[in-house]
Curated annotation (Swiss-Prot):
One of its GO terms (cellular component) is nucleus. This is Homeobox protein Hox-A9b. Gene3D superfamilies: Homeodomain-like. Belongs to the Abd-B homeobox family. One of its GO terms (biological process) is embryonic skeletal system morphogenesis. The keyword Glycoprotein does not apply. Pfam families: Homeodomain, Hox9_act. The keyword Nucleus applies. Sequence-specific transcription factor which is part of a developmental regulatory system that provides cells with specific positional identities on the anterior-posterior axis. SMART domains: HOX. It comes from Danio rerio (Zebrafish). The gene is hoxa9b. One of its GO terms (molecular function) is DNA-binding transcription factor activity.
Amino acid sequence: MSTLGTLSYYADSHIPHENDDHLAPRFSSGPVVQQQSRELTLLEYSEQEPYTFQAKSSIFGASWSPVQPTGASIAYHPYIHHPCSTGDSDGASVRPWALEPLPALPFTGLSTDTHQDIKLEPLVGSGECTTHTLLVAETDNNTTQTERKVPDDAVSNGSHDEKIPAETKLDLDPNNPSSNWLHAKSTRKKRCPYTKHQTLELEKEFLFNMYLSRDRRYEVARLLNLTERQVKIWFQNRRMKMKKCNKDRPKDI
């Protein structure tokens, strides 16, 4: 019923009437053809019952706002009919509404926003494409940055690997007094052996006195360019060495 009503309203709105003066210059060339077309259209739609349409605002409520059909026709034209230049004006005069674009026709009960959504789809697609391109550019920048970092790390690792064998060679050197029999790195400081002059002076001082006072220790350290701690440790080691020698010496019968 809604389809028949729509067609009847559609036909009534586009059938030319007697008092339509604006159609006179359009079809002034064939008055006989106009009369025949009016009779045909009246006979075709006379059997259908008239149907009254309500306003869009009363059906859908106050939330629906009327849309201008002219703006809709400007926004998107899915179908445009190009009339033939054969000179035959019968088809054009019988049904002139067939030449108008589809969005310009006032269909009540149908939303006119569908073509606007269709028009916005390419814009949304283009926006998504731009975001994809931006992401691709960002990933390309990240890959180039990582590719730049990898050679630098490789060069630094290569230089570090070159330094490690040199250090191991120094540790494995038998002439190095800091290396022990396991050839392992020691967390302790390297030994600072005493010079022959320092050793000789310390031996002389030890022969005179096995224990040094604080003042004498300070004087010996200042003369031999040593610290008080070094002088103290040397005297401790020398006393332990003397005790060991006395223990290993055979006792007299």
